[in-house]
Amino acid sequence: LGKLLDVYESRLLDVYESRVLDIYESRLGKVLDIYESR
């Protein structure tokens, strides 16, 4: 059971991290677009 939990936790972390990175990158991209259009 412990190993299964470890695998599940690491999967969850991977998904969470990639989602946070996606959101962060899209926000950063929008900010850069606004900054460059000036």
Swiss-Prot record:
The keyword Transferase applies. It catalyses: RX + glutathione = an S-substituted glutathione + a halide anion + H(+). Keywords: Transferase. It comes from the Eukaryota. GO terms for molecular function: glutathione transferase activity. Its EC number is 2.5.1.18. It is an enzyme of class 2 (transferase). Belongs to the GST superfamily. Phi family. Conjugation of reduced glutathione to a wide number of exogenous and endogenous hydrophobic electrophiles. In plants, may have a detoxification role against certain herbicides. This is Glutathione S-transferase 2. It comes from Populus euphratica (Euphrates poplar).
